Amino acid sequence: MSLDLPHPIVLGRSGLPGSDGLIDLTDYDARQHGVSRRHCILERRDPYLVVIDLGSTNGTYLNGDRLAPQQAVPVSSGDRLILGTLHMMITFHERASHQ
């Protein structure tokens, strides 16, 4: 999955199509992996990208460390993010310049 982050986004699951600001992980078996409806937020806090756990039931982990709820933690390219038991790898890509 590829994301552009002009504003904060929530990672989670929803039964409602088009939930504002929510990246719905249902297609990745989110419920079976213990992903909460509003699990965590990814947002830019220049010069960083941060992840914030939203008090999820099954936890948010960054590189194996469980995040405390409501604490912003910087994320780097190559980091492993786990929501419940759903594993992801964070990779940054340069934007193509349009000339």
Located regions from the model:
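Short coil/loop residues immediately preceding or within conserved phosphate-binding loops
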Residues: 20, 37, 46, 70
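Buried hydrophobic-core signal for structured, non-transmembrane domains
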Residues: 40-42
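ATP/adenylate-binding site constellation spanning eukaryotic-like Ser/Thr protein kinases
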Residues: 8, 37, 56
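Short beta-strand-initiation
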Residues: 35-37, 76
